[in-house]
């Protein structure tokens, strides 16, 4: 897959002019679709019969075996499609197919939390070609999705506002095309690492943008430039809410050695895909995990990932942060303005969710050189020990750090403190924490106190003050 990405960016496509198709209208290779610095290659989308877009319906009633539906009332009525439910389309990207495991896995995760029509859009006939051609074919894919949405509205009185399109890579821009063709009436579009080549910094008509739906949210996971870093995703903000997990460039767990990635737990094919495009694929894996972890992907408003990593963007500005992924639409300020940027950290493997806490420690006892660690205990769970500070430990000094826990502890009940000496000290000094303050991402503060001190490697439990 990696080789196809690289080669197809540099191979010429055949110039066309304009082509028209029944039902879908006309397509042009004039500017801005081609002949620009961002899209230098001329080319037209293929005939719909060649792309062969198929709609594969999964529902709570048929979670394991899809039903193929078309823009035909009798076909839809004989299926398990329900007009009183939301409909979520999933559109794959370059080289992929609608029957790939991750699309069905996303549907099955949805069925755990809601009753929904989940439609996997298969366009392998147009995705398994040169990238330059596939980037044109997504216009037809988007047009086909829009045609079905318009059909559902006109024939079954099904509102576009109940539609959510989830697109990965090129599928994000196909979703944008569907949104443009339905005049922004679609309820929501989620872009999962929208493809960069031929789309970044193009006019809005060409790519995904906030006007394509009532709400557009985007997850960026592979934003390095395609040349020379082989980053496949956009760094440009293109939604109402744009999330940059781990900075949006390099994802934890994507730097394993070649053998460990190819011999993946999910099989050789999935491992090979991860080796070729691990960062790019993380976007849909984060989304899938977010479905069953509604509070585990809080994004923090910040100027940059550097500021976020420097602990300058905590807690949530209004007491509530948007959740990256499935529940992004629950954020009250989701459409107050375009291009709102949010940052967060994730784990290096599933479950990717993390909960961020600020821990401030006021030291007591003797002056030594060492490092201190704190663990949290709450009514929902406990964390491991996290290092808060390393250096000169002076009584009365306050040190703070922010941690990303793989456990949501809930309401805190106690904390435990431990310290380690960096050098051998025969005087057996004692150090403690007179106060430890823990702040959750929602701004709630928990204070814990102790008058005790302990020797190195001895746990000290602090209770609420």
From Swiss-Prot:
Which residues are catalytic? 169, 193, 280
Q: Which reaction does it catalyse?
A: a triacylglycerol + H2O = a diacylglycerol + a fatty acid + H(+); 1,2,3-tributanoylglycerol + H2O = dibutanoylglycerol + butanoate + H(+); 1,2,3-tri-(9Z-octadecenoyl)-glycerol + H2O = di-(9Z)-octadecenoylglycerol + (9Z)-octadecenoate + H(+); all-trans-retinyl hexadecanoate + H2O = all-trans-retinol + hexadecanoate + H(+)
Gene Ontology, cellular component aspect: extracellular space
Under the GO molecular function aspect, what terms does this record hold? all-trans-retinyl-palmitate hydrolase, all-trans-retinol forming activity; lipoprotein lipase activity; metal ion binding; triacylglycerol lipase activity
Q: Which UniProt keywords apply?
A: Calcium, Disulfide bond, Glycoprotein, Hydrolase, Lipid degradation, Lipid metabolism, Metal-binding, Secreted, Signal
Q: Which residues are glycosylated?
A: 351, 398, 425
- Its Enzyme Commission number(s) read 3.1.1.3
Q: Where do the annotations place Ca(2+) binding?
A: 204, 207, 209, 212
Classification via PROSITE patterns:
LIPASE_SER, PLAT
Q: Which GO terms describe its biological process?
A: lipid catabolic process
How the protein assembles, per its UniProt entry? Answer: Forms a 1:1 stoichiometric complex with (pro)colipase/CLPS.
Q: What is this protein called?
A: Pancreatic triacylglycerol lipase
Organism lineage: Eukaryota, Metazoa, Chordata, Craniata, Vertebrata
